[in-house]
Design a protein with these regions (language model features):
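Acidic/His- and Gly-rich active-site-bordering loop/insert found
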Residues: 1-108
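Acidic/histidine-rich catalytic neighborhood of metal-dependent amide-processing enzymes
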Residues: 103, 111-122
Length: 122
């Protein structure tokens, strides 16, 4: 698996379901697992980061790379960590499945795929 695909699989394996007003009755809820993964990746890459507490188990992570070229334009990359609930999925939502060159799993296209691309690009 390539760097981006492996990173995406790592993210899909980390449930981060937004409860959307529902009772927190399962271990798949909230974004803490993805937050911890992002912190680990940024730390390993030597990228400064900060947590922003929103609610218990629902921290944001902000990382910042300084420009290496004077007066370079600012680029902002943004991705949310939460996914919609997994009810109704016909595959195991948190076990990445590659079929016909595509990865399936909760959040693979919204927005963990984009997040994986950003992480690998760093």
């Amino acid at each position: 698996m390539s760097g981006t695909s492996a990173t995406l699989a790592d993210l899909v394996r980390r449930p981060s379901v937004n409860p959307m007003g529902r009772d927190l009755s399962g271990p798949e809820y909230l974004e803490a697992r993805v937050t911890d993964y992002l912190v680990q990746r940024f730390t390993a890459a030597g990228i400064p980061w900060a947590r922003q507490s929103v609610a218990p188990g629902r921290d944001n992570v902000v990382a910042r790379l300084e420009a290496t070229v004077p007066d370079a334009p600012v680029i902002l990359w943004d991705a949310h960590q939460d996914t919609v609930p997994a009810e109704g999925m016909t595959i195991e939502p948190f076990s990445p499945l590659v079929r016909d060159g595509r990865m399936y799993g909760r959040g693979a296209c919204d927005v963990k795929g984009g997040m994986a691309a950003m992480l690998v690009a760093l």
